[in-house]
Structure formats: C-alpha cells, structure tokens
Amino acid sequence: MLTLASKLKWDEDLKGSQTSVSTSDSTRRFSMRDKLLVTEVAELEANLPWTCKVHFPDPNKLHCFQLTVSPDEGYYQGGNFQFEIEVPDAYNMVPPKVKCLTKIWHPNITETGEICLSLLREHSADGTGWAPTRTLKDVVWGLNSLFTDLLNFYDPLNIEAAEHHLQDKEDFRDKVDEYIRRYAR
C-alpha cells in the first residue's frame, strides 16, 4: 500500500519538475481510481470493524484485495468468511465487484459466492444502491453487517436458505454450523 502511495507522491513531485509533455505522460500512469484508493484504503484501515481483516496480495494493486469477516455473534459466529473485492477502472461511478470465496449457507449469499447487498448494485429500486459518495469503507461495513443486522430472510438471493430458516430455524442453524465446520475455519 505504501508503495503505490509513494509512487503517486513521486508522480506529483515529477509534475513540478518536468515539461508539460512529460508530465501528461507521467500522470496517465495512475487512474483516478488508483488515486482515490490511496485515500480510501487508509480510511478503511483506520475504521475497520474489529471482526474484519483486509489483505492486499500485491501492495501495488489496491484495486484487488481480500476481506475476512469473522462474526462474533449470531448464526455465523466462529466462522471466517473470505471475500474477494475488485475495484473496476470506472470506480467510483460504479461499485466494486465482490465475491464470497467461502461456501456458506446464507439467505443473501449464494453457495457460488454471489452477494445480495443493495450498495453493491449500480441501480437499486429502493435508492440504496451505489452512489459516487460511497467508499470502500461502506462496502466492508455492509459485508460485515450481512452476518448481523443486514441478514435478510425476506428478500433473499438464496431462496432455499431463506425458506429453510423460515420452516425450521434449528435445522437451519445446524446446516450453517456444518458449513462453518467444513468451509469456514
């Protein structure tokens, strides 16, 4: 992370010392997304929920990182759930792409990793979708909340999991526990 930030700083320093042709070539190396991410990643790391950890496999690529959510309450307590977050070039006009890498029995996450979280939608009927004013911090806090207060059995993506909960809460909990033992340790 510091590597990209250092490169951006170096790029800014170059602006003052090179001709306008060289400066424009130098400036093109970093997209607006990358410049935003330097600030947003610092803010994210300073404001992470204590049940979350971020990992940047390549510190020079702030647009690709992993998030681990380890809920401390509710159905998913004791599990470690991995998410892959990829920030597209058009960020912050479009939301990041997020996939759950951990197989999970959850009404708002499919077993293949698709996620139902309104702020990850480019357009949302209820007006809570993505907006350029949102940040990575909002995404991480939203993903964390899918295991607690945003857990929604009445507007599910995984209909089978939601119906399972509505029909037999105890059996639902048993299946969640089984998935945690098998996939989320």
From Swiss-Prot:
Pathway(s) where this gene product acts: Protein modification; protein neddylation
Any Gene Ontology biological process: protein neddylation
Active-site annotation: 116 (glycyl thioester intermediate)
SMART domains, A to Z: UBCc
Primary enzyme class: transferase
A GO term, aspect molecular function: ATP binding
Domain of life: Eukaryota
Cysteine pairs bridged by disulfides in the record: none
Gene3D superfamilies: Ubiquitin Conjugating Enzyme (3.10.110.10)
Entry PTM: The acetylation of Met-1 increases affinity for DCUN1D3 by about 2 orders of magnitude and is crucial for NEDD8 transfer to cullins.
Entry EC no(s): 2.3.2.34
Catalytic activity: [E1 NEDD8-activating enzyme]-S-[NEDD8 protein]-yl-L-cysteine + [E2 NEDD8-conjugating enzyme]-L-cysteine = [E1 NEDD8-activating enzyme]-L-cysteine + [E2 NEDD8-conjugating enzyme]-S-[NEDD8-protein]-yl-L-cysteine
Similarity comment: Belongs to the ubiquitin-conjugating enzyme family. UBE2F subfamily.
Function text: Accepts the ubiquitin-like protein NEDD8 from the UBA3-NAE1 E1 complex and catalyzes its covalent attachment to other proteins. Together with the E3 ubiquitin ligase RNF7/RBX2, specifically neddylates cullin-5 (CUL5). Does not neddylate CUL1, CUL2, CUL3, CUL4A or CUL4B. Mediates neddylation of the CUL9-RBX1 complex.
Complex and partners: Interacts with UBA3 and RBX2. Interacts (N-terminally acetylated form) with (via DCUN1 domain) DCUN1D1, DCUN1D2, DCUN1D3, DCUN1D4 and DCUN1D5.
Name this polypeptide is given: NEDD8-conjugating enzyme UBE2F-B
Origin species: Mus musculus
Organism taxonomic ancestry: Eukaryota, Metazoa, Chordata, Craniata, Vertebrata
